Amino acid sequence: MKSFVTSWADEVDADYVDGLPPSNEYIKGDYKYVTEYKFNDDGKKVKVVRTFKIEKQIVPKAVARRRNWVKFGDSRSDKPGPNSQTTMASEEILMQFIGSKEFDQTHETQLDPGKNIAKCRICNGEHWSVNCPYKGTSMDSKTVMETKANAAAAAAISDPSKTGKYVPPFMKDGGGISGSKNWGRGRDRDDSSAVRISNLSESMTETDLEELVKKIGPHTKMYLAREKNSGLCKGFAYVHFKFRQDAAAAIEVLNGHGYDHLILCVEWSKPQP
């Protein structure tokens, strides 16, 4: 009596008793079909059919050369492409390649030396607030602003003639007197907003003096007295502020302030003949 094979598993067992049949593949249109055989967890033979869609892509030359590498070791006899038994196909990861010009522009923008990211909130200097030398002292920007407001109010009370309105030159002090002693060199000099800073160290420079007074208010000029021979500071300087209230604020803030291991003495400059 002739026996009939009723399933593909029986056909496989009849032809390959001691092992699994080899996998096979064929291409039909834009699809590739791969048939494989393996044992499942229960020890039974199963047939797996994979379907792949063929797509043509333009890849870099380095990728094309890498795909033509000759396989070695146990995969020497494998066909081109990944082997499902030794390679696990993961999700595709897309990478964005930035050109050298774009990288240089981004790098220069981040490291632009002209843009200083550090700004002190105490004295508005080009350093971090934790490193500010005036932190916790009377030179705090908040204290300076309050002092300037108080000094401006006091200056307005002490000098009621300064109401902010325009005053013609001939109505100012000495404006209508011809041949006055104010005519000449001393006529253009106004010492009402000048202060004298004394008890300065010998190593004091114009740059240090500029850093000391610039946060209080704008000034028109300043003079640092120096020795003729050595060039060292004599210990005092004059600063002419643009506004009288700023000069009053400088006296209130800097007078008695410690600077370079010395206590500063700041007062109104006496009128010079």
From Swiss-Prot:
It holds the Pfam family eIF3g. It is found in: Cytoplasm. GO terms for molecular function: RNA binding; translation initiation factor activity. The keyword Cytoplasm applies. One of its GO terms (cellular component) is eukaryotic translation initiation factor 3 complex. It comes from the Eukaryota. Keywords: Cytoplasm, Initiation factor, Protein biosynthesis, RNA-binding. One of its GO terms (biological process) is formation of cytoplasmic translation initiation complex. RNA-binding component of the eukaryotic translation initiation factor 3 (eIF-3) complex, which is involved in protein synthesis of a specialized repertoire of mRNAs and, together with other initiation factors, stimulates binding of mRNA and methionyl-tRNAi to the 40S ribosome. The eIF-3 complex specifically targets and initiates translation of a subset of mRNAs involved in cell proliferation. This subunit can bind 18S rRNA. Component of the eukaryotic translation initiation factor 3 (eIF-3) complex. The eIF-3 complex interacts with pix. Belongs to the eIF-3 subunit G family. This is Eukaryotic translation initiation factor 3 subunit G-2. It comes from Drosophila sechellia.
